[in-house]
């Protein structure tokens, strides 16, 4: 199972944006919002997670363009980061969604020096972690696509995004 998440020393927060909803997964499904697969009843952990709140940025077609589910280190035993706060992240599959993630990171970096993006395969032990660092002003949608597309099972990947 692949797992993607963000890590920070500052809690992941909603920004004042009328298009960002903080909503329970089951309420989003009931409202007919078009959600990422991991938020739908067909996903294996939906029944367990349906009452959890998620943050969604909704576009003009009622599609969820960006989804974040926040949690703290105590709630996650597989995190490789030393940061205190985490948010589950699902791959952003279009340039528009990648740009939305970049803007979210830019906003979050107003409150902290860096955010880590992680991509790993749950299960095996790893000897090393592939690491890269990028300044937020230099981060492009293509960088995110490459980060996620070039993943292998051999080692987790971490991209540290800095101010």
Regions found by a protein language model. Give the residues of each.
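Structured alpha/beta or helical-core interaction and ligand-binding surfaces enriched in interleaved
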Residues: 1-163
